[in-house]
Swiss-Prot record:
Signal peptide span: 1-22
Record-linked InterPro entries: Bifun_inhib/LTP/seed_sf (IPR036312)
Sequence similarity: Belongs to the 2S seed storage albumins family.
Entry protein name: Conglutin delta 4
Any one cellular-component term (Gene Ontology): endoplasmic reticulum
Organism per entry: Lupinus angustifolius (Narrow-leaved blue lupine)
Broad class of where this protein is predominantly found: endoplasmic reticulum
Compartment annotation: Endoplasmic reticulum
Disulfide bridges in this chain: C29-C78, C80-C91
Keyword ATP-binding: no
Domain of life: Eukaryota
Protein keywords: Allergen, Disulfide bond, Endoplasmic reticulum, Signal
Lineage: Eukaryota, Viridiplantae, Streptophyta, Embryophyta, Tracheophyta
Length: 96
């Protein structure tokens, strides 16, 4: 009976640790997304401006590349992939 009680307590503790870890990851992801909003506000107008202009100079391509790198870093850091559609729209499809 004591072994069963210890086993149940161990499983409950393990579930609690896993749940807490998942909650922290979710909170971290939310913080990263909030942080990314600032970068998005900075980058999106520049990306749209670069894409909207005809022709491509080295300077324009460099700015677009920098913004896409920032978005890439943010999406890799946050596992919820909320930035993937943004990257596909601004960095992959229209930039080519």
């Amino acid at each position: 009976m004591a072994r069963l009680t210890i086993l149940i307590a161990f499983v409950a503790a393990l579930v609690l640790v896993v749940h807490t870890s998942a909650f922290r990851d979710e909170q971290s992801c939310k913080k990263q997304l909030q942080h990314s909003e600032k970068h998005q506000e900075d980058c999106f107008p520049r990306i749209k401006n670069v894409i909207g202009r005809s022709g491509s100079s080295g300077k324009k391509s460099e700015k677009l590349g920098q913004c896409c790198e920032i978005l890439s870093d943010l999406s890799e850091g946050c596992q919820c992939r909320a930035l993937q559609p943004v990257m596909e729209k601004y960095c992959y499809s229209e930039a080519k």
